Amino acid sequence: MKVFAHRGFSGRYPQNTMLAFQKALESGCDGIELDVQLTKDGEVVIIHDEYLDDLTDFTGNVRDYTLGELKSCNAGGKWREVYGFQPIPTFEEYCEWASGNSLITNVEIKSSVYYYEQLEKKT
């Protein structure tokens, strides 16, 4: 049996952030499940929902912002006051980090509201 950290160590840290992924690694899990979305300029970012309102300090949809714009978005969610600014990571940033450890990664492609034709090819 393998134990996966859902959205990283999301029970104690802001979900789908590099902090949550690092803490999941430190906890000894076997893998990480994460969610991806596509930005306005075609970059793959790690965030659960298509919309930003619930988990960030931005409003609207991920697909309406460029990566540059989203880099100033705080994905700290309910943990903002505890952990400060937590940027939305790119899938590339995650892959670079994950290449240095032995975690298994389960990528969930989110498309319940919008279909992203290129998302599968980019992940």
For the regions a protein language model found, what residue spans apply to each?
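Phosphate-group recognition and catalysis centered on beta-loop-alpha active-site segments
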Residues: 1-123
